[in-house]
Each structure stands twice: as structure tokens, then as C-alpha cells.
Amino acid sequence: MEYCKNFYQIKSNSEIFERIKAERKEVGYYNLPYQDTAEIKDYAQSISKKHIVVLGIGGSSLGARAVYEFLLPSNDYNKDLLFLVISKSGNTIETISIFKYLNSLVEIDSSNCTIISEAGSILTRLANDNNIKAFDLAENVGGRFSVFSVVGLVPLAMVGVDIDNLLNGCK
């Protein structure tokens, strides 16, 4: 393998190309723009709450917030809330702590809560045990790419963003 003075590879290397092709199959974010969004849109349409509270840290909340603030800013707040609890692992201490605290202030149940987490996580089990809507987050999608997964698409669809159009922009 040859490199120029700036460490750019001069010759093509089939091994590197094959690794990139293999990564495309293993890493989930490459396929996010092509996912089926029917369930997310149907669910978003069924929500009658006027406001949504997203509980999450890092990629579990920042991507959706950034897109929302850019596209649909609003300051109209009241108590007609839906708690959207997001944690990839389902046991993120900050998210769980906030969830428990809020549950001590207001009864959180299937009428005002949705959970997004990996299948089989503590949060997903809580959702299943309490008839709370849950979306499974793919294990192979990392936080920084999660805005184009259910982590970002569910809250964005709920506030009226055309998520199919958003995903088309990723293609």
C-alpha cells in the first residue's frame, strides 16, 4: 500500500473496499433511509396528546430535538402530555431516574407513555407488562445515527414532520 505525503492512499486496496462493503451489511445506519415507516406514521396519527416529553440522553433525544427545533418551533405548553421514554439499552441511569421521578409526580401508564428501546430491555419489558406502546430499536444502530431510526422518527412524526421526505433526503 502506498501513501502520499499527506497520508492519503495512492493505490486502491481491495481489502479496504471489501471491509467497507462488509460494514455496510453489519452497521444499521446505512439502511435507515430505506426503512418502512408505516407503523410509526400510524402510531403518530393515533396520538391525541398535544405535547410530548422525550426522556433520553445523547442520541436518544438530541437528534429529534434538533430537527424539531429547526422545523417546528413552539412554546405552547400544557399538561396534555405524552412521555416518550427513549434509551437504547433500556437501563440508562439518567433516563430511568427521570422516568421514576416523573412517575412519582404523575401516573405514567399506557395513556400517556411510549417507550423506545432495544427488544428485551428493562424498559421494553416494563412496556409489555403494562400495555404501553413500545418501539424496538435495532441493536446495530449507534446513538449518533439514531435520529433516522425510531429514536428520531417517532417523535418527529408525532409533531407532524414528513418522515418519509426526511428519509428521502438521506438517500
Positions of PLM-derived features:
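Extended, charge-enriched "interface" segments that sit outside catalytic cores
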Residues: 1-45
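Glycine-rich phosphate-binding loops that contact phosphosugars or nucleotide phosphates
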Residues: 45-171
